[in-house]
């Protein structure tokens, strides 16, 4: 089955054919480090984290580069507000970024370059553009002449005149044309600056990524990614510079994730309607945010709300419980099956895996892939509910449940980065806590299972867990009594 992805450049879904298989070169634009990352940043990070995992599953050798913009007007302004230097601000928020990434389970990129570490490479790119006549110097500033690049607008599907009329461009009296953009900015008092052939200054935003791609990946890469809001002007300007220098395609495929909105408005710091990743992962398990992102197709807008987080939490718990329930089922009476042949779950797992990967191969359709996940969860729940109602499970059913739940767990870990803190043999105390909090203790069969779990904990000298089960049962009106003949239980009067 071939992978097909939507290419912003062509405007259609195309078969993915790498330049030099099995190697795949990917670059995505990283954050400007002047504040904490918000859910909008998190969506892009999660989308490309999962896409990278899927490519690796397909057997590709992925080299993934994601940069830091660590010198910028916003960083400089933040430094002035705090009466410190820009690098202190950048270092602080890069450190906090790494904490955020660990907490939302996003793997580090293979290379994570900083702009300030690539000033010579940036200057080299600008020099080539000046030499080729695509850039001009005015009083220490250097600008790219947009009209000199004939293919300008091919990514955003707009012509030059339309762009001039409607684009957000940075005005300047020094520009020859309103659409021209800065490659190098002459130094200003109190701002960071580096030596260059045009005098002291600092790089413009659009040149940084070109220089870092050239250095770490080469002149043409397989995939360039980022948020939809970067198509114009940022990615359009990257194409203009890179292809003006090399005469080659800068990237074969351009992938853009949709924006995160709040009440229909783009989530952004300028509008003040943002929610930081820290706010989310201090309230919810990181898998809940990952699931929220994956429940929406990567190219569609995602409207964030705390209500949606609550809905997603329920979906997360349903998935997690289906896997953890294996431990409870093992505590039931296991009887020999009288049925022959393999259990239907084995075929359902095969069907799940085929459909799951087919959905991801069709323009990375994660919501459709998740529909197959929850179909399998439903089949697991049928087996579980039957066993609970009968107070026993056949060896045939238990083996099939174990096979299916472990298959599901491995797929979720490997591809979606979900349930990474669960193991095939799930911790009994976690299952016990969930069942107790669900208030299901008056089911006699379940009480016996919990007593058995407590006995195991005592035998293994995990007294914290044993005491937790006893105390929690007591809170819910069940009193345990340890006797030479075993543990007995009774309902507390009035319970």
UniProtKB/Swiss-Prot annotation:
GO molecular function: ATP binding; cysteine-tRNA ligase activity; zinc ion binding
The keyword Cytoplasm appears for this protein: yes
Cofactor note: Binds 1 zinc ion per subunit.
One Gene Ontology term from the biological process aspect of the record: cysteinyl-tRNA aminoacylation
Cited SUPFAM superfamilies: Anticodon-binding domain of a subclass of class I aminoacyl-tRNA synthetases, Nucleotidylyl transferase
Assembly and interaction partners: Monomer.
Protein name in UniProt: Cysteine--tRNA ligase
Organism, scientific name: Aquifex aeolicus (strain VF5)
């Amino acid at each position: 089955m071939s992978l097909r992805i939507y290419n912003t450049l062509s405007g259609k879904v195309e078969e993915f054919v790498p330049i030099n298989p099995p190697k795949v070169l990917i670059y995505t634009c990283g954050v400007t480090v002047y504040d904490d990352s918000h859910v909008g940043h998190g969506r892009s990070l999660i989308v490309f984290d999962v896409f990278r995992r899927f490519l690796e599953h397909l057997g590709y050798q992925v080299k993934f580069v994601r940069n830091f913009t660590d010198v910028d007007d916003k960083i400089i302004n933040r430094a002035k507000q705090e009466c410190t230097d820009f690098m202190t601000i950048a270092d602080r928020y890069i450190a906090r970024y790494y904490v955020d990434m660990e907490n939302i389970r996003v793997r580090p990129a293979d290379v994570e370059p900083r702009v300030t570490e690539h000033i010579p490479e940036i200057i080299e790119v600008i020099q080539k553009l000046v030499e080729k006549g695509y850039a001009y110097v005015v009083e220490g500033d250097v600008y790219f002449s947009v009209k000199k690049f004939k293919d300008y607008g091919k990514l955003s599907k707009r012509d030059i005149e339309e762009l001039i009329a409607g684009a957000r461009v940075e005005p300047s009296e020094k520009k020859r044309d309103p659409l021209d953009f800065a490659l190098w900015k002459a130094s200003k008092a109190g701002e960071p600056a580096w030596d260059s052939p045009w005098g002291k200054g600092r790089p413009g935003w659009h040149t940084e990524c070109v220089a870092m791609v050239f250095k770490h990946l080469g002149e043409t890469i397989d995939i360039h990614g980022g948020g939809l809001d970067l198509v114009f002007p940022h990615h359009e300007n990257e194409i203009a510079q890179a292809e003006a220098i090399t005469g080659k395609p800068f990237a074969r495929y351009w992938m853009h994730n949709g924006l995160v909105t709040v009440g229909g408005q783009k989530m952004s710091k300028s509008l003040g309607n943002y929610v930081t990743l820290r706010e989310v992962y201090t309230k919810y398990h990181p898998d809940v945010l990952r699931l929220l992102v994956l429940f929406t197709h990567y190219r569609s807008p995602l409207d964030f709300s705390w209500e949606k987080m609550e809905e997603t939490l329920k979906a997360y718990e349903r998935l997690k419980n289906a896997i953890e329930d294996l431990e409870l089922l093992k505590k039931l009476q296991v009887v020999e099956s009288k049925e022959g042949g393999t259990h239907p779950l084995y075929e359902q797992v095969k069907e799940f895996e085929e459909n799951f990967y087919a959905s991801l191969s069709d323009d990375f359709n994660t919501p459709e892939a998740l529909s197959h996940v929850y179909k399998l969860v439903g089949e697991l729940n049928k087996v579980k509910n039957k066993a609970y109602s009968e107070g026993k499970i056949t060896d045939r059913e238990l083996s099939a449940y174990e096979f299916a739940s472990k298959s599901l767990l491995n797929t979720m870990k490997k591809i979606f980065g979900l349930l990474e803190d669960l193991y095939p043999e799930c911790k009994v105390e976690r299952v016990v806590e969930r069942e107790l909090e669900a208030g299901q203790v008056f089911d006699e069969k379940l009480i016996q299972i919990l007593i058995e779990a407590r006995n195991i904990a005592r035998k293994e000298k995990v007294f914290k867990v044993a005491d937790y089960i006893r105390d929690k049962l007591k809170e819910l009106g069940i009193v345990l009594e340890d006797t030479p003949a075993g543990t007995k239980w009774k309902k507390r009067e009035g319970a």
